[in-house]
């Protein structure tokens, strides 16, 4: 199990990213728009830099929903590989069977 402080930090990042998502997307689109003047694009980049660092969605980490493990997490299930294995063998994940050939 991951430390609670790390899980709380991740939740804080998610909330902050959700709060600034619209503004972040607008500024990002403006700074990447070739039709805009160089001055407008530079101003958009400056505004992006003024946003909180954790407002960037790239800083979020996918974690296992059960254990909080940051690595080896499958997006499809939101679980770490070890938990997928446990739950699959127990028959708790529908449609997953042990490979046999």
Curated annotation (Swiss-Prot):
Keyword rRNA-binding belongs to the record: yes
- Write one Pfam family the protein is assigned to: Ribosomal_S14
Keywords for this entry? Ribonucleoprotein, Ribosomal protein, RNA-binding, rRNA-binding
Keyword match rRNA-binding: yes
State a single Gene Ontology molecular function. rRNA binding
The UniProt entry's GO CC annotations, sorted and at most eight, read: cytoplasm; small ribosomal subunit
Query: Which biological processes are named by the entry's GO terms?
Result: translation
Kindly list the residue ranges recorded as spanning the membrane: none
Q: What's the stated role of this polypeptide?
A: Binds 16S rRNA, required for the assembly of 30S particles and may also be responsible for determining the conformation of the 16S rRNA at the A site.
The UniProt entry's sequence similarity note says: Belongs to the universal ribosomal protein uS14 family.
**Complexes and interactors:** Part of the 30S ribosomal subunit. Contacts proteins S3 and S10.
* UniProt xrefs under NCBIfam families: PRK08881.1
Q: What is this protein called?
A: Small ribosomal subunit protein uS14
Species the sequence originates in: Polaromonas sp. (strain JS666 / ATCC BAA-500)
